[in-house]
Amino acid sequence: MAVEDSTLQVVVRVRPPTPRELDSQRRPVVQVVDERVLVFNPEEPDGGFPGLKWGGTHDGPKKKGKDLTFVFDRVFGEAATQQDVFQHTTHSVLDSFLQGYNCSVFAYGATGAGKTHTMLGREGDPGIMYLTTVELYRRLEARQQEKHFEVLISYQEVYNEQIHDLLEPKGPLAIREDPDKGVVVQGLSFHQPASAEQLLEILTRGNRNRTQHPTDANATSSRSHAIFQIFVKQQDRVPGLTQAVQVAKMSLIDLAGSERASSTHAKGERLREGANINRSLLALINVLNALADAKGRKTHVPYRDSKLTRLLKDSLGGNCRTVMIAAISPSSLTYEDTYNTLKYADRAKEIRLSLKSNVTSLDCHISQYATICQQLQAEVAALRKKLQVYEGGGQPPPQDLPGSPKSGPPPEHQPCTPELPAGPRALQEESLGMEAQVERAMEGNSSDQEQSPEDEDEGPAEEVPTQMPEQNPTHALPESPRLTLQPKPVVGHFSARELDGDRSKQLALKVLCVAQRQYSLLQAANLLTPDMITEFETLQQLVQEEKIEPGAEALRTSGLARGAPLAQELCSESIPVPSPLCPEPPGYTGPVTRTMARRLSGPLHTLGIPPGPNCTPAQGSRWPMEKKRRRPSALEADSPMAPKRGTKRQRQSFLPCLRRGSLPDTQPSQGPSTPKGERASSPCHSPRVCPATVIKSRVPLGPSAMQNCSTPLALPTRDLNATFDLSEEPPSKPSFHECIGWDKIPQELSRLDQPFIPRAPVPLFTMKGPKPTSSLPGTSACKKKRVASSSVSHGRSRIARLPSSTLKRPAGPLVLPELPLSPLCPSNRRNGKDLIRVGRALSAGNGVTKVS
């Protein structure tokens, strides 16, 4: 236990003047300034009342100093009550007493100063001993359920330097020194009262046995020093193998007053009693002086000069919190006694005390273990019973907050629109709740999708947007304009009463309107990115599917048809790329970077989304093949890395796949639709979805990384002899508006003015427009010859974006044959006529032919 340093607390109480002092008509020598300051022998005011005698033969100011100021911890005036003194002395000490600290309160002063009145009181006005006992038992009863208490009391007096037991009167008792208990009185009786009333009865009986004799100074003068001690032993009620026991002692001491034989006119026995009283008080003063002068030095303290000081050894300078009550008289008749009392009280303030809680750990015997276990089990059972009562009676009913996500499936009439509170963190949490509702909606409509072939084609597309908010939750909230242009059908599913009860749905509709305006502003400023467009379409598709009830397939078809203007609007900024594999409506044709490809393919591959219905085993088996990389040449090792990230590599044509019948027949486009339908029905070779211009696809080159925004950038002139690393697999997701046939090639190429850059060392065609896809077989045989290529790519391909207003889309399909990579390749000789025909077409379209 840590040691706490403290000082002796000193309070001063000024008693009211007695009738004898009032009759003497002497001026008071004590003036109370405030609660802590008093002035001894203040200056006499000028112009006193006539007839009053302020002087005399024993007038103090003639011998002592004037106007002395004393500061104490507390000063009580003549009007102070017993309760006031108790509240500022023993009441605060009881807190430390119950924490295991020893405490002591003693009254010091001259005879007739009011010490016994302060400590004992009278019938109608009890003193500190009575009030302390009542307050102590009140606090013990308040802690009865937590701890077990035992109270012992003893009452003794020091009369003529002899110790007597006031509760069981007998002969003088000897005093002993115990190494563990300290100073003990041999043969002193200890009593254990059962209640506060019984303790007060014991105290009253002891006071009757105390020696009191009247003197000229005091009619009820105490001729002995009374010491009333209370011992409290407390320990926790929770049993254990080791228990902490606290034993504290409180001493309430009523000292006898110092007296002068000249004033008391004592003779015989009274004179001897007065001499012994003064002797013990003188020893007490010497102890106070020694303790005050110590200040950390090890000096001798004369405790053995008197039995009183031996009994008060631990209360004055030991492990005890001590309060000294100095009682004084305001009359000048006791001028010297009052001065001495104030002087010693002021000296006692410098006494420093070291406090330590008396806590002892006791180990229980092994024979008590069974009893301790039973007590612990009984306590656990009682606590469980209380807990059940509290939980049964005090549990608040669960509140259904409108913003909290529902754990059950959503109703049929409720659209899957999340509740969107304000704040970015709340928006991110709401996107997760939207995903859970979409998954439950997908499970509920799985039976309808199996019955309809159109739903089977759209099945994979419905699963893809379910996981899209996980890839970029910060962009999962904006929505396409088509979603918010139709708020009335969504609200129509609710009745008037449900709309009044669930305002969160109205809030969701307002947020969707805000998303519409954001989408329009971003599109007008050309700030839309492919991720944002995909997420807008994802949220649009989710809300549209939630609105469609089971069995309303006609509404779903019409809903997809209404999405055509939006798809055209989203794809109007990109150039359509012809390809022979365009069996589905067009989708997004913007550039897709590697980061976008990894973000799209990673989660879908992990989720195991099945391929589309058009996938064949022959095509699906080509994906697990290991990629074949071309060894870079010495010059290419020094080229910058940026152009390589946007290049592609051609391996072999996919026209033999058409001849083998592994791909479906090309059908003319019936009209544009949303990208979700196109993405669902496009050829897929694995659960992983790859964008159109990723390095593993076969579509023509897309714009560079600097052209991801819709506004074309003016790039500086770069080397056109760029080496492109194209994929060997067919595209997993064509992203074109329409399919163009062979008969439309001259017309289509005549409108394109972007330079076309094939691989060196073959004829280089500079043109406007995208690079035709490879369609001739046998290109894989030239792989070893292309390794020795010395062309270095120092620039990027510049493919201009034509505005949507100037772009005319042919209706027929366009199928371009694959250009030979080298004129020396024997496998390409049979296609010479096709090469010449394409070259003429390119020349007719303002193309420039260069032969290396």
UniProtKB/Swiss-Prot annotation:
Residue numbers bearing the Phosphoserine modification: 404, 452, 480, 558, 633, 639, 662, 822
UniProt region (Disordered), positions on chain: 390-424, 437-485, 575-594, 602-689, 767-798
Chain residue ranges for the region called KIF2C-binding: 711-736
One Pfam family in the UniProt entry: Kinesin
Keyword Coiled coil: yes
CDD domains, per database record: KISc_KIP3_like (cd01370)
Phosphothreonine: modified positions: 417, 674
Any one GO molecular-function label of the UniProt entry: cytoskeletal motor activity
Composition-biased stretches (Pro residues): 577-588
Main location: nucleus
Assembly and binders: Interacts with MAPRE1; this interaction is required for efficient accumulation at microtubule plus ends. Interacts with KIF2C at microtubule tips; this interaction increases the affinity of both partners for microtubule plus ends and is required for robust microtubule depolymerization. KIF2C phosphorylation by AURKA or AURKB strongly reduces KIF18B-binding.
Descriptive protein name: Kinesin-like protein KIF18B
Lineage: Eukaryota, Metazoa, Chordata, Craniata, Vertebrata
